[in-house]
Amino acid sequence: MGKGFSFASVILSYFLVGGGMFTATLVGSELQIGTELAAYALFAAGAFAGGFVAARASRGQTILEPAIGAVAVVATIVGLAATTPIGKLIWVVAQDQTIAFVGSVGLTGVVGALVGASVSERLLGEATQSSIPWIVYTAMAAFGASLLSTLFASILFLGDNAATRSGLDIGAVVLIGMGGGCLIAGLAVGASSRVRPLLAAFLGGGLGVTGFFTLVTRATPPATSDAVTGVALLAGAGAMVTLIGTVFGGVTVGRKQAT
């Protein structure tokens, strides 16, 4: 077991489990999996992967934080759906089916994250003292945080009449989501890590942003041939923002928890 409950690890687990579940959904879409059972299995697999990694990154109770993170992810999905016109329409037209779907997704997410965290703890024990694995942890956290932050930013700036009020286009919203996601992910990494994974945070942040923008460009293919250069520049910017967040999180929270 770890050294007590860690709220920073809950935030990190939230991004890791969320990133795992959304990645599993994208994989299912690419594979054109149409059965309901297979979709739930993918949700569980994504939550398992997120919970497994979250347990390795947690400095606290290990199993508790990924479970709370999974619940928060499900709450986010419900909240985002409830704020969109299509989500409100689905709720009115098929309330019973919606409740059943949300319950099933919530159950598979929480169980998957719990099983992943339990397996991780039993096989590998407490959180690692090495900074090398934090490249993977930070990459997954930056990816998940960028994705979730962009969803929030889309609702805030593009939902309903917000687009005319904010004057922002989808590109600006994606950049806001990426920047905010990398900063929050870095803060969570710095606060949760038992080491000072500065280089790992820089590399992981860049990898996470690369994965995020690869996803974005697949959804909306760029019109120019400079996409690779653009993604590289954005990955470098994301890496720097993640590093800044990691330094600040380590100084303000991580160092206090270590003493």
What is each model feature region?
Residues M1-T259:
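Juxtamembrane/disordered regions of integral membrane proteins
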